[in-house]
Amino acid sequence: MEKKSLACLSFLLLVLFVAQEIVVSEANTCENLAGSYKGVCFGGCDRHCRTQEGAISGRCRDDFRCWCTKNC
């Protein structure tokens, strides 16, 4: 019984450690409004951010504007 408890606790600590590392790695990006994207954002935002703004990715948000994700 004690071995099961120790194994379960070790697994839980490993999961928490990995989850913390994921949060830290995601925190190295910033999302900014695309500077040269014109018009309402329905599509093509990702391609625009990658090619024109030098960003990692782009997405249309709820406000129908193009937001680019860059390394901070």
From Swiss-Prot:
InterPro entries in alphabetical order: Scorpion_toxin-like, Scorpion_toxin-like_sf
Superkingdom is Eukaryota
Q: Which SUPFAM superfamilies match?
A: Scorpion toxin-like
The record, for Gene3D superfamilies, names: Knottin, scorpion toxin-like
Induction statement: Upon contact with the plant pathogen fungus Fusarium solani.
* Localization in the cell: Secreted
Xref: Pfam families: Gamma-thionin (PF00304)
Keyword ATP-binding on entry: no
- GO cellular component, as recorded: extracellular region
Tell me the disulfide pairings in this chain.
C30-C72, C41-C60, C45-C66, C49-C68
Q: Which GO terms describe its biological process?
A: defense response to fungus; killing of cells of another organism
Assigned keywords, A-Z: Antimicrobial, Disulfide bond, Fungicide, Pathogenesis-related protein, Plant defense, Secreted, Signal
Signal peptide residues are 1-27
Protein family per UniProt: Belongs to the DEFL family.
Protein name per its UniProtKB record: Defensin-like protein 230
Specify the species: Pisum sativum (Garden pea)
Q: What lineage is on file?
A: Eukaryota, Viridiplantae, Streptophyta, Embryophyta, Tracheophyta
